[in-house]
């Protein structure tokens, strides 16, 4: 029998029986010679940044989940349930985002361009308006952001093509495509997020003491340094509020020089405060006020505060608005400062549209509108200077607020305008007859645009979300060192949330590594098992009935020879 089988196999390999031999040996040949997928196509590893997750005043915000292990789809797919939905920023809309959540998507990954400055302005504005809505909607769906690269773009395009083909095919084609198509399994390397205990929010203060007695009036200059956006690791906050901190540091430099000489040493104390937690209802300012007004007997804030000037988003545009909770009364120093701002803007910077915006404090709101409201609640005269007319403007809390959005010349001009108005108030120049069109800061005392640019570059070179600014990190140590060059009694203030009733809670797992593995669908294993079973069944049947197979082959050979 074995000799006969050998004869049959030998005959099958002859030219006349090549098709039959090809069929018999084809599966083995394919298994041996099929090239493996290149490593780059089989798997890709990239960094992802998770959406905000925090609690504020007991209210949860953002995504509540961090674990992801599901197959990728684009928003074009018919079925998104338990799938990782890939979206590009250029094609993103809030309606599509809601669609993914409504269909119980397993996760959402939004792919951002590498060069954010090249993104069209209408796309940036639309996404800025969308970010607060995304955060306001608490969800258990993990939401991640990734920066585009060639491999990730290829994954997106392949997934999009598969989703589009599946949507336009017939039912049979969809079934076949479902069973045989390649897909990508998206898997994160991290674990489930958990609350970060005892996280410290740090603020930095310094002062310039006025010349004269102990009961001198105090002018407080405030700006929060932290940034905010839909993803903490992508929050660089160039305009909000890198511009405010840059102006504060430049004012500290300018007035430290004026206070160095007795002839220009004014009879005002200047208190500079770089606050932390500004994007979380001004937690640093709130606790700083409590410590200075409730828990100490010697503080510049307790007696004779002339006014508090808060700086927020002053790095672009040709408008400046002085936001107040209560219009200043005539005869007060804050009213004099308002008039000086108007005069300097009109005579030295006519292109600037200056106005005062009056908005009462809404204590029913969980989050205050502007930082000056923290001071106004404690009955300290305060206002906020900003180029934004409304506190609801999306520019204040967006990952799109990058360095390119701050215009260096505009920032320098606004710094000079603020410095000129402050100087005219402090030295009472208007009453002394100095015309409003005569600049004070000239020659060696000029505003240094290079200095402002270097500070802006330093601030925007790192994410400054409150969850990421460590008390021992380089950001705070550099900020403290910078202020120490010009101010006296520079020190840090640390606060942490109450353990029993925390006002704020931060969570970890905000930055992870995601892997995209090329995989076949689960049904492909079933289809492959059926095919292998059928092939083995045919082979088994052929062996069991070899005599019949042998006779059939012989007849075919004889017939072929006679022809």
Curated annotation (Swiss-Prot):
Residues 43-522 are lumenal. Residues 1-42 form the signal peptide. Keywords: Endoplasmic reticulum, Glycoprotein, Membrane, Signal, Transmembrane, Transmembrane helix. It is a single-pass type I membrane protein. Glycans are attached at residues 241, 428. The keyword Transmembrane applies. Its main location: endoplasmic reticulum. The keyword Nucleotidyltransferase does not apply. Residues 544-563 are cytoplasmic. One of its GO terms (biological process) is multi-pass transmembrane protein insertion into ER membrane. Pfam families: Peptidase_M28. Belongs to the nicastrin family. Component of the multi-pass translocon (MPT) complex that mediates insertion of multi-pass membrane proteins into the lipid bilayer of membranes. The MPT complex takes over after the SEC61 complex: following membrane insertion of the first few transmembrane segments of proteins by the SEC61 complex, the MPT complex occludes the lateral gate of the SEC61 complex to promote insertion of subsequent transmembrane regions. May antagonize Nodal signaling and subsequent organization of axial structures during mesodermal patterning, via its interaction with NOMO. This is BOS complex subunit NCLN. It comes from Canis lupus familiaris (Dog).
